[in-house]
Swiss-Prot record:
GO terms for biological process: spermidine biosynthetic process. The keyword rRNA-binding does not apply. Residues 17-254 form the PABS domain. It catalyses: S-adenosyl 3-(methylsulfanyl)propylamine + putrescine = S-methyl-5'-thioadenosine + spermidine + H(+). Keywords: Polyamine biosynthesis, Spermidine biosynthesis, Transferase. HAMAP family: Spermidine_synth. It holds the Pfam family Spermine_synt_N. S-adenosyl 3-(methylsulfanyl)propylamine binds at Q48, Q79, D103, E123, D154, G155, D173. InterPro entries: PABS, PABS_CS, SAM-dependent_MTases_sf, Spermi_synthase, Spermi_synthase_euk, Spermidine_synt_N, Spermidine_synt_N_sf. This is Spermidine synthase 1.
Amino acid sequence: MEEANNKESPYISSILPGWFSEISPLWPGEAHSLKVEKILFQGKSDYQNVMVFQSSTYGKVLILDGVIQLTERDECAYQEMITHLPLCSIPNPKKVLVIGGGDGGVLREVSRHSSVEQIDICEIDKMVIDVSKQFFPNVAIGYEDPRVKLHVGDGVAFLKFVAEGTYDAVIVDSSDPIGPAQELFEKPFFESVARALRPGGVVCTQAESIWLHMHIIEDIVANCRQIFKGSVNYAWTTVPTYPSGVIGFMLCSTEGPAVDFKNPINPVDADDSHTKTRGPLKFYNSEIHSASFCLPSFAKRVIESKGK
């Protein structure tokens, strides 16, 4: 693994020396900056540039291709919500597939559910896994669960070999729809996910920001309504270091036993047996679960129009 060196990163701002600035065509005309105390790692995998730095205010930060993936301070808001929104909406999930999520945070959260017997994870970039284990052990702790089976490879290709109806839940923890994650936002991928789910199975996928990406969200909603014949919903949460400070999730179910995503029936926050090894939940609870489906009027109009 390539270690940090004194070579200046292209993502360290030349306008504000010593600050990391997140600049992307996905959010033109704006940037979010964090003060850098020390660059801990820089490397280039077969798929993307990887960087870790110590920030002044958010702890250690993981960057992929110039975009913040997680910080120690606020990763809980994303990891807990993308995991427990789907898993708390169905009774006794047993088989779970995670696509992406190489940092291990979703695995950490899935492992809180005692009913789960099998956790498969398919991550394309081994460097992300190795870097997360080295610099974010409290996140990557999920890999230590004996129920976890790691598959290093392309999630799209992995799904093609999954038997129909294998999983109770699929969680797609992808980066933004450019580069290696682009296929994870396209219709053929969602069709593969639906085939891999049992009747009444659920999927939760990262679905961008209502403030920045309504055009992308519209396409995702339209595709999901064509493919998933159960329930299709959009939820959101707040993550301060993500662009616009919020991130959304598509939650869908296949035809079969009805799933009411807005009313959790399998509350993980009612059982504290998992806290000894995973620590207490920092963000998720049953009340915020239901509240996350309440959308601002402008977003509600657009998303509901795609169901007509």
